[in-house]
Amino acid sequence: MIFLLIFSAVLFVLYAYVGLRFVMPMDIQLGYKYLICFALFIFYCFPILGIILYFNKIENNLSTLIHWLGYTGLGFVSLLFFIQAGADLLLLLKSLFAKGHSFDPHRRAFLGLSAKTIVGSIAGLGSIWGMYNATKEPVIKRVEIKIDGLPESLKGFRMAQITDLHVGSMITGKFVKTVTRKIKELNADMLFFTGDAADGSVQSYGKHLQSLAEIHPKYGKYFVTGNHEYYSDMNGWLQLIEGLGFKILVNESQNIIVNDATIMITGIPDRGGGHFSSFHKTNMEKAVGGMNPSDLKILLAHQPKDVEHALKYGFDLQLSGHTHGGQYF
């Protein structure tokens, strides 16, 4: 409830600012301004309604439409907000430092409307580009990791990582099947899934992950929870993911023998997991306790902020998700 109130308040500021500073100064008839502001209010309501539906586990075609409308609109308005705020800041600086001069009010009105048309077009195109990037076929990013003292038998060892699939009303099985195909083509020795598998219930969206069962790396596949695993039927999702062949690491480690070398894979729950289950509270002592010396130590942690644990316990590599590659929305 508190989250919903805070979210609604922040959104209200965002949409109200766009209405007051972008829409109302337009040189158009007042009735059109009110109509645009009314549309803004409707789109303001969609994300809030989407969250209410999400937490009440109402998942159907109508809820999917509301999610698409709400978050597409939010992306568009957020871009407008930042562009308009930047323009207002420049105008403020100009008013403070520039000397006053006469101007043609008709010319100013024309330039103002032209500027808003350009800004609106940029925000619209940016939103379309963002939605395209969010739903297009995923791109494999290849990274060569250099680790000092790595045994010869581990050089060339291939690991694949997926994270933050967020299957649900917007990301479906079609997308996951593409991910599965690309991973199989890599023929990786090991697969890691660093959390946030889904948004919603297992009953509605569990089917979208089924293709991941087709991936069979030689040295196994491993999963750690993200924050979204705890928002809807945590146990149900973990049971499904385990059924797909993943070893779920909850404050535990696995020693994997590769030729004559040993890889230690340690997995910890999301940093917020302890708020939902005492068993899912991060416990590094438990996670690394009793493990034998290894040639390569890998930490799986959903949030990059857990790097403090990687440093403290001498891990060679940390794999995380959560940030969506720096995507702000």
Sequence positions of predicted segments:
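Non-catalytic terminal accessory segments
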Residues: 1-135
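Soluble catalytic domains of enzymes that build or remodel membrane lipids, polysaccharides, and related
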Residues: 141-142, 146-329
